[in-house]
């Protein structure tokens, strides 16, 4: 299975490795040529067979907006974009609409596991249509921890729900870390 992955930082780099170990053919793009498999987003689009599935693992905010706009220009009808960065859930609907206007599907994925996800698997909280989630399940099955699906993957609702769940997860986690820190 051929996939694209944009953003090869600590997590994206390891996700590419885990997907490759799981039998996926992954082409990665990053502005840093020493880790990138292709030179540009256009090269990535041209190298992948349509319909394409591309995972985006870039920081939230302006970079995500710029990447979504760039992808709308180089993707075609039937493609699917998965935003796995820590995007704000309220930004997902506008990104999904921008892509939907071109016939491109969108899934938001809250990802937990950090750099340990390479060996342990990633906890995945995803939002999107049933059809888009089903299409991306081979990716999710490879990235999640081994064992029962529900131990590492949940489809929490429509577009935006995955990043909302990740926000709640982070709030609880950071609150617990603060409480532990206060106790010592």
Located regions from the model:
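Rossmann-fold NAD(P) dinucleotide-binding segment
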Residues: 41-107
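Residues at the C-termini of beta-strands that transition into short coil/loop
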Residues: 30, 41, 85, 110, ...
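NAD(P)+-binding Rossmann beta1-loop-alpha1 motif at the extreme N-terminus of oxidoreductases
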Residues: 1-52, 75-78, 115-117
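Short beta-to-alpha linker loops that shape the active-site pocket of alpha/beta-hydrolase fold enzymes
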Residues: 32, 59, 112
């Amino acid at each position: 299975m051929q996939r694209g992955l944009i953003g090869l930082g600590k997590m994206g780099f390891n996700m590419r490795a885990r997907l490759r170990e799981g039998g996926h053919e992954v082409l990665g793009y990053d502005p840093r040529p020493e880790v990138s498999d292709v030179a540009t987003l256009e090269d990535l689009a041209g190298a992948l067979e349509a319909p394409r599935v591309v995972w985006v693992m870039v920081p939230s905010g302006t970079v995500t907006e710029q990447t979504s706009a760039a992808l709308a220009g180089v993707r075609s009808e039937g493609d699917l974009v998965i935003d796995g960065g820590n995007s704000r859930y309220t930004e997902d609907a506008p990104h999904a609409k921008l892509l939907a206007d071109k016939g491109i599907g969108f899934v938001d994925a809250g990802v937990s596991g950090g750099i340990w996800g390479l060996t342990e698997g990633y906890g995945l909280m995803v939002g999107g249509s049933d059809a888009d989630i089903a299409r991306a399940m081979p990716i999710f099955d490879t990235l999640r921890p081994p064992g029962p699906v529900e131990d590492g993957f949940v489809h929490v609702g429509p577009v935006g729900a995955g990043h909302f769940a990740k926000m709640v997860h982070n709030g609880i986690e950071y609150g617990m870390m603060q409480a532990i820190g206060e106790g010592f």
